[in-house]
């Protein structure tokens, strides 16, 4: 059964089930604001409309924001510095995003010539920036009492931007039942000198408790914030290390059942059924990945999974993700004054668009949720270049069907 038949049967069934979770509200029945202009195709196949929109969107803003932003040493600081779970958790009490302005962020994206925003709803640290009943480890239940994803969804909807929610599917350093380092991947947990009492995973069967948690959170994300452009999964390395533990088909089907137009990405690819590929900085090379963080006994399988998925996904739309900081994705104080300038970003855009790819450009908000002044300046200048034709000429040629 193909996707269109599956979704058609699903919606027909949903219409006959009183109280079904698959029943759409009047707001959801209308075309999402970011898909305006695609009404005809949307009426025929909402997913096809979303794919066509994404191919034409070309340029998006990514944000990595979380508790780690308070430390200013990147989004992997918990793992790299082996910060104990209990110690790291205390940053929930000092989380204060008082300068996180969703409307200003959306306006900045528009000023830069972007068509969509991708933001971390949960990074590897496990802290959630959305309303969830699955854990108190979230921004709404913090002293800040802010549902940042809800605020961002409202701003994007109002301004016609697509919203992708980044979700750390195959890493969670806080959840008690994510698998251990010894189960296959060095980055599954920080390499603590002492066992952490919060970690309860003992055998593969325990991992289902984590998957149930993930699926419940995906239901929340897909039912609380209106139509989403997509779910952006990461980090694929955690999947490559243990593909047997992740029920991808079940996870993907859940997403499509709740929002048929919603796109799914999982970096360069997990099983090849993703809607587009989103490799970091550049497309994967032909040489096998050394997978140094994966147990040697699992590297051959990891490469087979990667090769199979990329063989399929490289024929789809590609989204190259890169950073305005020279190094990591979350805010790094050491990079202050060293961020990329507009000229370099224009080169990235031209290179991506010449290949027919999208560019997803990341900024790491500061601890208070504000965007780096360096990045604001660069993004506005990039937008002026695009509106002036410096970067958009390639786009125009592509739309006319000319070769680039």
Question: Residue ranges of each PLM-predicted region?
Answer:
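Mature catalytic domains of secreted/periplasmic carbohydrate-active enzymes
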Residues: 8-12, 26-404
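N-terminal twin-arginine translocation
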Residues: 1-5, 14-29
């Amino acid at each position: 059964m193909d996707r269109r038949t599956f979704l058609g049967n699903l919606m027909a069934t949903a219409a006959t089930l009183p109280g079904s979770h698959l029943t759409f509200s009047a707001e959801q029945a209308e075309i999402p604001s970011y898909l305006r202009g695609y009404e005809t195709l949307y009426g025929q196949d909402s997913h096809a409309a979303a794919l066509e929109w994404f191919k034409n969107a070309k340029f998006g803003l990514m944000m990595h924001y979380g508790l780690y932003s308070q430390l200013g040493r990147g989004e992997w600081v918990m793992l790299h510095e082996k910060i104990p779970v209990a110690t790291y958790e205390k940053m929930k009490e000092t989380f204060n995003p008082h300068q996180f302005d969703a409307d200003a962020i959306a306006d900045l994206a528009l000023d830069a010539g972007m068509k969509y925003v991708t933001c971390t709803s949960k990074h590897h640290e496990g802290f959630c920036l959305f309303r969830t009943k699955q854990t108190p480890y979230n921004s709404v239940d913090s002293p800040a009492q802010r549902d940042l994803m809800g605020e961002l969804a409202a701003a994007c909807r109002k301004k016609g931007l697509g919203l992708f929610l980044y979700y750390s599917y195959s890493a969670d350093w806080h959840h008690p039942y994510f698998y251990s380092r010894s189960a296959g991947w060095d980055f599954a947990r920080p390499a603590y000198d002492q066992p952490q009492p919060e970690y309860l995973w003992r055998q593969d069967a325990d991992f289902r408790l984590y998957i149930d948690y993930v699926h419940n959170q995906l239901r929340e994300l897909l039912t609380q914030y209106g139509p989403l452009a997509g779910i952006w999964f990461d980090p694929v390395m955690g999947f490559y290390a243990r593909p047997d533990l992740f029920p991808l088909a079940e996870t993907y089907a859940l997403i499509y059942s709740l929002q048929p137009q919603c796109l799914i990405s999982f970096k360069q690819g997990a099983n090849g059924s993703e809607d587009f590929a989103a490799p970091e900085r550049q497309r994967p090379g032909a040489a096998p990945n050394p997978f140094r963080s994966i147990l040697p006994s699992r590297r051959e399988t990891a490469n087979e999974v990667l090769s199979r998925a990329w063989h399929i996904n490289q024929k789809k739309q590609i989204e190259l993700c890169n950073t305005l900081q020279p190094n990591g994705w979350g805010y790094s104080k050491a990079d202050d004054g060293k961020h990329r300038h507009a000229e370099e970003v224009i080169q990235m855009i031209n290179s991506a668009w010449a290949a027919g790819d999208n560019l997803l450009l990341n900024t790491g908000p500061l601890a208070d949720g504000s965007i780096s002044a360096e990045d604001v300046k660069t993004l506005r200048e990039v937008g002026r270049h695009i509106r002036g034709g410096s970067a958009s000429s390639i786009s125009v040629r592509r739309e006319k069907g000319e070769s680039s």
